């Protein structure tokens, strides 16, 4: 989201949300909470990168939805998603319209697909890569109150007040931490 074009009330809500995430992360020596699209860890955060076929993506949400459409051989929706140039929500909406979707197959493949997109995003953007590596060994937590699969099902303001065993799956946090380890390993190999 571009703060300069956002209505004043929406800007205030986003600033409060980011402050809450920062406060919750600061209160923990174990977790780093994120959710806002201004966070580099969000799939909606703008970050250009190219996949193995030379396709240009403007965010990892676009990559995810494009590959979701390809998984189910919906080339029309895939092209629609790839043609989007700046709005991750439009990609998400198009991804929900994928024909022949089998949710079990999607759930079996989603983490691998998103993991590859996240790796490309961070490995091709040095400033984002530095931010990911700066999280050291903290557990990255998507504090999405309405998502118990990719997030934990709680906002950052509530996350530390409930037992972690009742958190959602946090798949996005997991793929980010896997990407962090993969990038560290690649960097170590380059130094040798």
What are these regions (language model features)?
Residues 3, 7-192:
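Charged, low-complexity intrinsically disordered segments
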């Amino acid at each position: 989201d571009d703060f300069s074009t956002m209505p004043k009330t929406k800007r205030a809500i986003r600033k409060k949300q980011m402050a809450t995430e920062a406060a919750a992360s600061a209160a923990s020596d174990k977790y780093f909470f994120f959710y806002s699209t201004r966070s580099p860890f969000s799939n909606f955060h703008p970050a250009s990168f190219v996949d193995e076929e030379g396709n240009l993506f403007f965010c990892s949400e676009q990559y995810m939805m494009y590959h979701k459409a390809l998984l189910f051989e919906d080339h029309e929706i895939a092209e629609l998603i790839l043609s989007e140039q700046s709005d991750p929500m439009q990609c998400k909406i198009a991804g929900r319209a994928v024909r022949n979707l089998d949710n079990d197959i999607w759930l079996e493949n989603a983490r691998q697909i998103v993991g590859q997109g996240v790796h490309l995003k961070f490995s091709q953007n040095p400033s984002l890569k530095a931010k990911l590596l700066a999280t050291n060994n903290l557990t990255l937590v998507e504090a999405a109150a309405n998502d118990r699969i990719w997030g934990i099902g709680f906002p950052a303001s509530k996350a530390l007040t409930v037992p972690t065993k009742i958190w959602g799956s946090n798949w996005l946090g997991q793929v980010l931490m896997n990407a962090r380890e993969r990038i560290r390993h690649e960097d170590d190999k380059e130094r040798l």
